[in-house]
């Protein structure tokens, strides 16, 4: 087994290589053994330190999945149940098809309803593939301002891209928005408040939040993109996903 020093040396070398090869512009890594930290590495300058905050974006889905599984463990949701058990409108979802002019039409009825398990595993077909992306593009901005409004829209205006459970296709927004909304309904709490109470506070994670303070914003790590071969910092104003459902703020 490598020593703690060898592990840190390997991580530092990997970070230096990625920086030199322009594969990344900075990062932070920590290794724990038996629940105890054995090394930490930071590369990319002063803005990548032990107190830097990182935007999670769709990595928020990990917390959403954990929240649903905890609710299942507590007997408050059934992941094998149809989504319509919590949001009745989802009983009437149809499989859709794209028309030649880029619109979406109902094509057929699915053989069964989608379940929470389908949403967790990206096998529901909701908000997936080209059809799902198109429906999200067509979704009025006013319907994206809260989980409640977004979930209602998904249940009444969206279509499935394929038969539930027949295959997997990533759902960037809709699937996990619906799961987060179900968590709100069964707990009577906002999704962010539930995660804080169930995970962030008990685990001592004060910097994991849906609503960063000005002090926390000041510690955000930079985001960059390559423009004509050079790294250029992207200046996000406030919350990156402001105006989208709470799952992604």
PLM segments and residue spans:
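Short, conserved catalytic-motif segment at the N-terminal edge
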Residues: 2-57, 76-78, 95-99
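Residues at or immediately flanking beta-strands
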Residues: 26-28, 82, 167, 209
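Hydrophobic (often cysteine-bearing) scaffold residues that line and stabilize catalytic clefts
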Residues: 3, 7, 11, 56, ...
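Alpha-helix N-cap and coil->helix boundary residues
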Residues: 26, 78-82, 190-194
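Short, surface-exposed loop or secondary-structure junction motifs
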Residues: 93-249
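Phosphate-coordinating loops and pocket residues in cytosolic domains that bind phosphorylated ligands
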Residues: 50, 84-88, 121, 196
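Short, low-complexity N-terminal intrinsically disordered segments enriched in polar/charged residues
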Residues: 1-2, 167
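Active-site SXXK
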Residues: 11-16, 29, 35, 55-86, ...
